[in-house]
Amino acid sequence: MSTVVNFQGKKCIEPGSYAAVVYNPTSVVNVAEFGNVMIIDTGLSLATVNGQQTEFAGGSGVKGELNQGLKSVYQFDNYEDFLAFMGGGLVGDIAYKIFTPRDGVAGAPKLFYVRAATTTAAKITLTLSEGNTLVFTCKNEGLAGNGIAVDGIVKVGYAAKVVAGDASGKFKVQIIKGTYKGADEYGEPYGAYSLAESTPDIITESEDLGTLAEAYEWAVNDKVVAANFNVSKKGADSTALKAIAQVLATGGTTVFLNDGEYADVLEAIEELDLTFFLCTNKNAASGAGVNAETNGKLFTYIKQDAKFSEHMFVPGGEDDTDLFGESNSSQSIAKYFNSDQVVVVHGAPVVNRKDGNGTKKLPTIYLAAAIMGMNAGMAAQTPLTFKQVGYQSFAYDLKRKEREKALQAGIMHVRNISGYWCVNQGVTTLQNNKQTIAPDGQSLELSISLIKAQINKELILEGQVRFTGNTAAQASPESVKNFTETKLASLVARPGEDNLLISWKNVGVTGRNGDYFITYDFVPNVPVNKTFFIGNMLDFTF
């Protein structure tokens, strides 16, 4: 039986390295990544096209037909690949700000995406005759695979048909994919073309074929087919092909948050190297920011179960009506979480319409994505304070008194500084903001919280490789102490080289049975928020 160690309020049972930071002052190659972002989709990808429900998403839900669990978590290191995977939609549009928070500024190094949903795969069934079929099962499961056509033209999802070949008596199989990327609440398309203008792509076409066996052999060996479908057949191999009119993919289903899917996501991602979560409530309306089934569960996870110290960005209110208040407001969200691992962002960007017909208001999640993406592209110790965001107009401009109250309430917001809209201060939702570092080690400053998290991650990742699974003779207290001191020294800032720490001291190691407990003191590389210049004016003399 494994011993249970209570470490900083967590029950540690499995072998491994664990780390925490407390505020209790006393008289190597860094391996951890920073800035990886995760989106747990709770229905943001759903849309309606031509009166039919669809979805702009790829892969399978966490409870999928073809994949489940961690295999349903998808990773991307650039926006183009993510957009191609999603096929458009609101999530695809928001993600641009995660990778490129503003023009010329790099954002998150990686984006992880998963649907907290149960999905079944859509299928295209080409029937040659009774009992003789060729079936394409969509790997993009759920509603996303279902074909939707307008006047016979595929707009989203998949379809296939069999057309006459070049030689007499031969036929070609064509696989078709819609290219429409959806539209926002104002009816403006996310992509370059409207629903009426969009035309489908023939993503692959076979050579001349004559029988079911030949069609199946082509399908299982075609790279495009393999990337998009599982292929099966029924019937006699010698069945002759024939022309078949366009057949839409059908039968794909997506059900979000129905049967423990959110918990399954959290279980699947436990070992992933993540820094930020972008919560998928659009704003503070209807209590979505504090939904116990989504954001509430995520908060419990990052506080109790996550391997690393991760952070949530929660979209808050949009204007003056939902800035303060006991419910459905940025203030109520901040009070609910009250943690330095949670950020609530207030403010709805206003942008020009693509058709040039005035402006439109975007939901707060766009600003949250932009700020989070900007933070993800910087070093952990770099504060968000006075960093320019990628928007230049907002639904409501906070007055000075409101900005001051918002900072005290733990609400991150923007402010116009010398003609540019910037983050006023990189604050967390921690309500105990009388001092920069609270007695429990939490901080009102996001950059300090991220410093803590990054130090912990560095120690965990390298510590478990060096020591876990060795014997006490191989991993002596002296070697553990030397490693910790070397690691901390590598994280100290020096002239011309910024880093996580200003200084460290007092590394101590104690052992009990097969467990080592390492303590150390450090001074984080804190942000500079205010500068006060006092001039001493002198009399003119000569």
Language-model features: where?
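A generic structural signal for well-ordered alpha-helical surface patches
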Residues: 482-486, 518-520
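A glycine- and small-residue-enriched flexible loop/hinge signal that marks low-structured segments
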Residues: 2-469, 480, 487-492, 501
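Compositionally biased, low-complexity/repeat regions
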Residues: 497-542
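Short, solvent-exposed mixed-charge patches
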Residues: 1-2, 542
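A short beta-alpha structural unit
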Residues: 470-474
